[in-house]
Amino acid sequence: MDGCFLAPLLLYLMRLLLSPDIMKLPIDRQVYDSLLEQMDILDISSATIRQSGAIAKALETQSGAEFLHLEMGIPGLPPMRVGIEAEKQALDSGVASQYPNMYGIPKLKEQASRFLKAYLDVDVAPLGCIPTVGSMQGSFSTFLLCSHLVEGRDTILFIDPGFPVQRTQTKILGIPSDSFDIYDFRGDKLGPELERHLQGGRIAAIIYSSPNNPAWFNLTEDELRTIGELATKYDTIVIEDLAYMCMDFRKPLGKPFEPPFQPTIAQYTDNYIIMMSGSKMFSYAGQRIAIIAISDALYHREYPLLPVWYKMSRLGDAYVFAVLYAVSSGATHSAQYALAEMLRAAADGELDFVTSAAEYARRAKISKKMFLDNGFHIVYSMDGDEPVSDGFFYTVGYKDLSSGELMAELIRYGMATIALSTTGSRQNGVRVCVSQLNRPEQFDLLEERLRLFAADHPL
C-alpha cells in the first residue's frame, strides 16, 4: 500500500484504540476560530489566563470532550483543616459584623513575623506584617505605593517571565514598566543586565517570583545577592513574590527554625517587601488572604513624595492608612484568623505544608515526561548547572511553533495552557500547571492527546 494512504489509516486506527473523547479531537479549526471571534479575542497569544479557561470550557461544552485544564493555578489540594476550623470559630464569635483593623489582627501579625523567622530566618517586626486580600491586592497596592515615593522614579521593573496579571495591574494604574527575560541572564550575566536598567534612575521597584511562575526556576543565593546589592546601590525597592515558598523540592526545605531556609532577598538588602500568600502554601485561595511583609528599615523610612500624595511621610503608615484603606478597608476579618492559625501551626511544626505541596512535584514529574516523550522540550530547563525542580508549573515548547501557535494547537487537542508571551517571556512555548491533574485517568488522557498531537505534528 502506498505510504501516503498508510499514514492516515494508521492514525485512524490509533484513534479507535484510544478513549472515546479522542474521536472528538482535534476541534475543527473553523469552530475554534468562530469561538474566538465571538469572545472578541483577536490574538490567542495575548489571551489572559481566565480567557484561556473560558475558551476551553466553551469548546468542552460544544465538543462533549473533557478538557485538561493546565492553564490556571488553582490549588489542587484540600484547604488546611486547621484554617477552616479557626475561621469558623471566628465567624461564630461575631467578627463578620466588625470591620477589621487596617493593620491586621494582632495574632496574625505576630504569627506572620514568627513564620518568616521560622522559614526564611528573617526578622520582620509584627508591625510590618500586613494582611491583604490575596497577593493580587498586595502587588497592586505596592506598585501604586512605590511609584509615589520619589519624583521621577515611577517605573516597575519585571524580571521576566512572571505572573501576567501583575503587568496588567501596572497598565491599569498607569504606571510605567520595564522588563527583561532572565533566560539569557542567569548567574554572572544577571548583574550587568539589571544594572543597565537601573542606571537610568527611573526604577521604583523590582519584582520577581522564586520559585518562578511560570517557569519554576529558583534564583540562586548569588543571584539574590546581586539583586540585593544593586537595589541598595540604586535605592530601589525589591518586591519578592514568595507565593510558592519552600517548594523547591530538590532541597530539604520546610523544617521550621532549621536550615536550609527559603532563599530570600531579605538577606541582602533592607529595601524589600515580601509577598506571602495563603493560596498555594495552605490551599486557601478562595478566602483571598495574604501577607505583605515590609522590612523594618523600609517601614519607618520617610519619602519626599508621600506627604504630597497621602499627607503622611512614613512608608508603612502611607501604605496602611492611605493605599490599602482606599482599595479594601481591610482584609476579610475571619480569613485573618484562619491564616494566623495556619502560620502558627506551621511554625510549631504541626502543619507540614511543604510535604503536602510535594504532590505537585509528583504530578509534574509524570506529566513532564509525557511531554518530553512526545517531542516537546522544556523551555526554562536549568538552574545554573542543575535541572529546575518539579513543581506547580513548568514550561514546554514544540519545534519552532510560536507561543500563540502552540497554545492554539494544544487547546484544539483538549489541553488548555497559557502562552509564554503573556508572561513577558521572549521564548516560544506555553506554561503548564499541574494542579488540576487530580485524577489518575487525567494522566491517561494527557498521554493520549500528546501522542495524537505528535502524530499530527511530526518533528
Residue ranges of model-derived segments:
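Short hydrophobic/aromatic beta-strand micro-patches
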Residues: 293, 395-397, 433-435
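Conserved core of the PLP fold type I
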Residues: 95-234, 239, 245-268, 273
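PLP-dependent enzyme catalytic core of the Aspartate aminotransferase-like
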Residues: 114, 118, 122-125, 268, ...
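N-terminal small-domain helix-loop-helix segment of the aminotransferase-like
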Residues: 26-29, 38-137, 188, 343-350, ...
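Conserved glycine-rich beta-strand-loop-beta hairpin in the small C-terminal domain of fold type I
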Residues: 333-336, 340, 353-368, 378-397
